[in-house]
Amino acid sequence: MRIADFDPENRPRERFIAHGPAALSSAELLAIVLRTGTRKNNILDTCNTLLSLHGLEALANMNLKELQKTSGIGPSKAMQITAIFELNKRLHYKRNTNRKIQGARDVYEYMQGRVPDETKEHLFVLHLNTKNQITKCEEVTIGTLNASLIHPREVFKAAIRESANAIILVHNHPSGDTEPSNADRQVTNLLKQASAVIQIDLLDHVIIGKTGWYSFRENNQLS
């Protein structure tokens, strides 16, 4: 059935106009953006399939090639979907500019949507001013943390250049398990020693997983 064949009061566009976006399901909102379906499936069916297969959160992180594996999603629609979520991420970043960090929860919330590929480990450095506000988020390395591969110079170089008062290390665990590995502990100790020499405080090292985090400071592993 085509969307045009729906009763007028059940069409997503008409319901949007009458009741606002909050009255629509995620699939209906996506259908309004993508607009047209195929001969076999109307766009609402396609959007329902997308969301039932992947969910909204996973959909936000899919690339163009992955999106096009779903019937009815070609290059143009894949780009539209990607553009929607990219705008949302940019709004999130804008709202969090100069956010004051009071604990690991703030770090976890700030980093939502910032890891480009959650199948790999990414190490980020957050630069903080004297008010503990984030002034910059810098990605330093991609891949498993290893003390022999991470040089303090690379971690502190931008912080020195921008006169950061302190930094926070953040990296993700693709497995979702936030328990630190021996390598994580070695890297933390190495950079803590370097911070004392450089006189830029290492406030915390936060490991983020799918639904939580581990803070070295909050677990008394970083005094």
Swiss-Prot record:
Keywords: Hydrolase, Metal-binding, Metalloprotease, Protease, Zinc. One of its GO terms (molecular function) is metallopeptidase activity. The keyword Cell membrane does not apply. It comes from the Bacteria. GO terms for biological process: proteolysis. A motif (JAMM motif) lies at residues 171-184. InterPro entries: MPN (IPR037518), RadC_JAB (IPR025657), RuvA_2-like (IPR010994), UPF0758 (IPR001405), UPF0758_CS (IPR020891), UPF0758_N (IPR046778). Residues 100-222 form the MPN domain. Zn(2+) binds at H171, H173, D184. Belongs to the UPF0758 family. PANTHER family: DNA REPAIR PROTEIN RADC, UPF0758 PROTEIN YEES-RELATED. This is UPF0758 protein Cvib_1178. It comes from Chlorobium phaeovibrioides (strain DSM 265 / 1930) (Prosthecochloris vibrioformis (strain DSM 265)).
